[in-house]
Amino acid sequence: MESPTGLGTAGDVLHAAGQLFSARGFAATSTHAIAQAAGIRQASLYHYFASKNEILLRLLTGTVSPSVETARTLLATQAPASARLWALCAWDARLLVEDRFNVGSLYLQPEVDDDYFAEFHALRRELREAYARLIIDAAGARAAVLTDLVLGLVESVILLRRRDPGGVDAQTPGLVADGALRLVFVTEQESSAAHRRGAELLISLPHADRSDVRIL
């Protein structure tokens, strides 16, 4: 049978699960419902995923691992910290904005506190540490508080999408990144330069594509 999404059976399952988890919640969604939405038998689902938890883990890590990869690259890049921070904020916000089913809204599901999701939490910690390092370099002291503020701003797009699905667009990530620089006391003049240089950094990322220009 042809894949409904063109992503293969595993991709079909993730696509269906993302939609159902976001609409109904994790606990209220059965593997039977996921399989039915993916166009396969429930027994076939277990050839690709051992459990519903594994499906959720794949979805959650997919919202973080690309940003972690970007953060690693930016930390090793020779450029002003403010520009690298802008680039990371814009990339991270874009990933959350463009996620089809707003999977980031599942971060606070109580099931995610389980040890099974340690890989996801480890990625989140690494991403937070990358933000903290860039903020220290860009703003000096007060890194702990500022890191939480910046991450809160970036991830606010999750709630914005939930409240008003049409309230975010291709310009939102750049606006979020601009706002993050103001939170860490970057001056208006330096912020403009950081925006320009950060946009250049995004386009030059090895795993970027030309569509990144949409957030500039």
PLM feature spans:
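N-terminal intrinsically disordered/low-complexity leader segments
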Residues: M1-G8, E190-L216
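Helix-turn-helix
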Residues: D12, A16, L20-R58
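Hydrophobic alpha-helical connector segments
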Residues: R58, E69-E98
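Amphipathic alpha-helical packing segments from all-alpha helical-bundle domains
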Residues: V68, D113-L151, Q171-G174, D178
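Amphipathic alpha-helical segments used for helix-helix packing
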Residues: R84, A93-A118, T147-G152, L159, ...
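Hydrophobic alpha-helical segments that form the core
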Residues: R94, A141-V184, A194-L205
